[in-house]
């Protein structure tokens, strides 16, 4: 059993609601965290994925707050992260509690055109937001750590996300750069991680109450900046994976005290059946591990009802956008190359070029380029080569394809391992084809008649693929 820091136990005993048991808390903290996944509805339905995996011995239990989330039990020899279905982006291995903030943000079903995810990496919530937005609009996915942006981009590509612009800033800058610009904001704040002990038994080993105030100060700065960046009428969801009030309720009350009636706490009681078990008097969800057999978590939904005074100067920023709009000739050549593979471009596609590359930009990007610097925007569709235009892997992973060549699971495994696929009935060479499994794309291969020559980018090839 996990050994909890006694100072933490003494502190949290004063925080826990009287109807909950400390013995239950300690017991659940010592249990392994249940494995959970979220189905990527940009590529497949939940019913379709269950029909694929249940015959292999998978058992699914719905996560009550996420329509496409499931706790799963898998066979002992199965490694879900190595499955072909995982590599092709049909599901994301995501802790159940972390599915809650995006669901809270979209619980009213209001359309969101311009959204900020303040702390995006590795991408679980960002990709969930993209699915809820049906790959429409724009998500600004911010990650301060340069080393973590690589994982973020890899997951966006794997899951077929096309509506994201990546930034790399301290999250406290957005109020200044994007004052009252955004329709919605997801702020999963850095925290002391008190709720993560089931995933990391050593997370509380060095727990120290003196550090919490420093963390809470950062959280107050982050939520203040986020609220400044939010449009009047917009919604902010604040969340943490910790348990103490200073990093949770108190941070939300700080915002209320600062901006008064412009801040409205919206109750999450109707987010799912049973939410009342974790509901605070303000309408927040303060989730203790024993309530839903999950991580500890906190979620608040906050509406901005009126404009507020700007508390920072408008920063001067000179944008150097390295792209130019594709001309008619370039667009015609691109469309011909995409059509040959059966890839469809959106009707409102904004296509730009740079150094012979074609990029698809999210439509709502206009007006933002003069406000801040972006590390990466949209998806790379294709590039001009000596013998014509070559469509890129990330384009076929993110855009509708209607001419895919279906292959068997074993062939898909070989493809993801970077190997060519021999064809039993040699015929006429057919050129580049998009390979698919379960009706979802795997990537591009060149049909040479007697084999499919692998075109999967080398950095995406894996040695440990399972079926």
UniProtKB/Swiss-Prot annotation:
Where, in this chain's numbering, is S-adenosyl-L-methionine bound? 119-125, 143, 170, 188
- What are the record's GO terms for cellular component? cytoplasm
Q: Which InterPro entries match?
A: Methyltr_RsmF_N, MeTrfase_RsmB-F_NOP2_cat, MeTrfase_RsmB-F_NOP2_dom, Nol1_Nop2_Fmu_2, Nop2p, RCMT, rRNA_ssu_MeTfrase_F, SAM-dependent_MTases_sf
The UniProt keyword set, sorted, is: Cytoplasm, Methyltransferase, RNA-binding, rRNA processing, S-adenosyl-L-methionine, Transferase
Q: Tell me the enzyme class.
A: transferase
The record's comment on protein family reads: Belongs to the class I-like SAM-binding methyltransferase superfamily. RsmB/NOP family.
Q: Which PANTHER family match?
A: 28S RRNA (CYTOSINE(4447)-C(5))-METHYLTRANSFERASE-RELATED, NOP2 YEAST -RELATED NOL1/NOP2/FMU SUN DOMAIN-CONTAINING
What name does this protein carry? Ribosomal RNA small subunit methyltransferase F
In which organism is this protein found?
Shewanella amazonensis (strain ATCC BAA-1098 / SB2B)
The UniProt gene name for this protein comes to rsmF
């Amino acid at each position: 059993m996990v050994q909890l820091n006694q100072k933490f136990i003494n502190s949290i005993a004063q925080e826990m609601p009287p109807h909950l048991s400390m013995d239950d808390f300690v017991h659940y903290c010592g249990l392994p965290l249940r494995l959970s996944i979220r189905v990527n509805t940009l590529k497949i339905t939940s019913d379709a994925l269950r029909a694929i995996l249940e015959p292999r011995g998978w058992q699914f239990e719905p996560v009550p707050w996420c329509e496409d989330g499931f706790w799963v039990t898998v066979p002992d020899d199965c490694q879900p992260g190595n499955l072909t279905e995982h590599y092709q982006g049909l599901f994301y291995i995501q802790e159940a509690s972390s599915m809650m903030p995006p669901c809270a943000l979209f619980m009213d079903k209001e359309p969101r055109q311009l959204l900020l995810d303040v702390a995006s990496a590795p991408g679980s919530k960002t990709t969930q937001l993209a699915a809820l937005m049906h790959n429409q609009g724009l998500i600004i996915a911010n990650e301060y750590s340069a080393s973590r942006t690589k994982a973020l981009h890899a997951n966006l590509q794997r899951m077929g996300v096309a509506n994201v612009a990546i930034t790399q800033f301290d999250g406290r800058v957005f109020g200044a750069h994007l004052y009252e610009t955004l329709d919605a904001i997801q702020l999963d704040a850095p925290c002391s991680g008190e709720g993560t002990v089931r995933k990391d038994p050593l997370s509380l080993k060095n727990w120290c109450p003196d550090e919490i105030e420093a963390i809470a100060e950062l959280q107050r700065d982050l939520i203040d900046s986020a609220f400044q960046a939010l449009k009047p009428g917009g919604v902010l969801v604040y969340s943490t994976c910790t348990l103490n009030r200073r990093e949770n309720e108190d941070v939300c009350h700080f915002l209320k005290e600062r901006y008064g009636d412009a801040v409205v706490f919206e109750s999450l009681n109707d987010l799912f059946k049973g939410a009342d078990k974790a509901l605070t008097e303000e309408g927040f969800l303060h989730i203790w591990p024993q309530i839903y057999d999950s991580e500890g978590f906190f979620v608040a939904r906050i509406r901005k009802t009126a404009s507020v005074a700007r508390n920072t100067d408008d920063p001067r920023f000179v944008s150097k956008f390295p792209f130019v709009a594709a001309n008619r000739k370039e667009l015609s050549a691109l469309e011909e190359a995409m059509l040959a593979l059966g890839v469809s471009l959106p009707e409102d596609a904004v296509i730009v070029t740079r150094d012979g590359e074609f990029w698809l930009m999210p439509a709502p990007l206009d007006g933002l380029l003069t406000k801040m610097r972006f590390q990466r925007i949209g998806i790379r569709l294709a590039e001009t080569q000596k013998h014509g235009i070559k469509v890129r892997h990330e384009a076929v992973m993110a855009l509708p394809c209607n001419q895919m060549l279906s292959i068997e699971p074993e062939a898909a495994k070989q493809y993801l391992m970077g190997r060519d696929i021999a064809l039993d009935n040699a015929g006429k060479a057919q050129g580049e084809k998009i390979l698919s499994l379960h009706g979802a794309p795997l990537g591009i291969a060149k049909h040479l008649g007697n084999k499919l020559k692998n075109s999967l980018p080398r950095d995406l090839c894996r040695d440990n693929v399972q079926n």
